[in-house]
Amino acid sequence: MSSVPGDSFEPYRNKTRISKLRRAHVQRKDTYKDPSRPVGTQSEVPIVNIASDGAVRVRGYQNYDIYTDGQITFRTKAHKFSKIEAIFAKLHTHHGFTSLIDVGCNAGLISMIAWRTGFRHVMGLDHDSEYVETFNRVAAARNATDSLHAQVFSFGTPMPTRAEVVFCGAILHWVFCLTADFSSGGFDSILRYLLQFASEYLLVEWIDPSDDAMMGFQHIKKCGIDGIENRYTVANFERAVATHTTLMSKQSLDGPSRVLYVMRVDCRAGLSPTAESPSSRPPALNRRHGPF
């Protein structure tokens, strides 16, 4: 991904904030779902098969196929990813956005959906090096490395760039206090962190404590902090959303325990990244903010 003048991405250069972020929220400890895998938090090993014509088959935590014409087939949770696809299409078509950061990108399905709907500057970030490698292999097979790129990343450290849209899917229950440590500041600090890298919209998937995955693995309880489970609530999350952003929409992605919050970036309480110097901000391709 280039950061030449005119690109939708610009490098993040605020050294003071970088220093504070590194001290405050670096990955606290390695906590893996399956100890047999040396990286990541998922049990599934990523597998990618690339045909001679460029068609791609990905299996693992995410399961999808990309055909030679660019069409994507969702092999699991098609209803969920179809909803996300519709939201991305609206962000691109109605608002003109073309840059997106996919936080917790895994094998790149969300990024591929964004690319398919018209985003042309997409960066994936994940702490699992095997899935990051899979993402980049898929991008290369689709001849899309100028538009799609992923790199290894620890949540809470500075992102390498900023974008008009930041998407953070299905990792809140991990980063709240387990694979990262935002326990002291809670959802307020998580949103403040993410908002530094989104110039227009922030999309976050809420994972409710009633979710089967959370009830089975007990992510928050595993943090070992007294009373922490009482802080990981939808009421606290929505309070932080209302404090730091304008909520444009929310919709269930996969039952009532997984809900996507679509937020517009504000200038509240000096928390907006627009407080930085104009030269450090990505250009606003279209700043229309009608009803989402």
Report the location of each language-model feature.
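Conserved N-terminal segment of class I S-adenosyl-L-methionine
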Residues: 6-161, 289-292
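Acidic, Ala/Val/Gly-enriched low-complexity intrinsically disordered segments
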Residues: 7, 269, 275-276, 284
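A conserved beta-strand element that flanks and buttresses the S-adenosyl-L-methionine
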Residues: 167
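Short catalytic micro-motifs in class I SAM-dependent methyltransferases
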Residues: 170-174
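A short, conserved alpha-helix within the catalytic core of class I
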Residues: 175-193
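Conserved beta-strand signature within the Rossmann-like core of class I S-adenosyl-L-methionine
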Residues: 196-209
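Short alpha-helix
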Residues: 227-243
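Core SAM-dependent methyltransferase catalytic element
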Residues: 251-273
